[in-house]
Amino acid sequence: PVFSGVGGGLTQGARSSYMSLFAEAQGSLGVVLNGPTPLETVQEVCQVVDIPVISTVTSKYTEIDEKLEAGITIINISAGKETAETVKYFRERYPKLPIIATGGPTEESIRETIEAGANAITYTPPSNGELFSRKMEKYRKIEKNDQS
């Protein structure tokens, strides 16, 4: 994977550090810590890897200054329906900080998140099953129209 999740919620401390080292050794370009990661874990992970350490932000109320001082270099905003607003909030306060954000389910929400200041968007594409289902539905409509 490009980025590897290395804990922060249930998994903390040395275990997150070891996972970060393994991820780096396997070619990950960055490691991601969950929102509730304790500062001590952030510090440990930042000390053991040379790749970017990314911290997940879940709302505009998330405190990030100490984590930035510890070595976080990118934030990953995942604030549900408030993602664009949260991106805007952090972009205004940290104009040069790289921000990755979830874009939401529509082109409009993705565009809104980019316009709010996200540098990159994470997106989960439809599964093969979903794509196949859509294709089959089109075939059924064509057949139905041909019979009418």
What are these regions (language model features)?
Residues 44-46, 114, 127-148:
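C-terminal helical cap(s) of enzyme catalytic domains, especially alpha/beta-barrels
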Residues 15-22, 62-70, 105-121:
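Catalytic cores of alpha/beta
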Residues 1-7, 46-55, 91-102:
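Short beta-strand/loop segments at the ligand-binding rim of alpha/beta enzyme cores
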Residues 1-29, 51, 107-108, 128:
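Conserved N-terminal beta1-alpha1 strand-loop-helix module at the mouth
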Residues 23, 45-46, 66-67, 90, ...:
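Generic structural signal for hydrophobic
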Residues 28-38, 77-86, 116-136:
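Glycine-rich phosphate-binding active-site loops on the catalytic face of alpha/beta enzymes
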Residues 26-27, 48-49, 70-71, 94-95, ...:
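Short, structured coil segments at secondary-structure junctions
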Residues 5, 28-38, 52-63, 73-81, ...:
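Catalytic beta/alpha-barrel core
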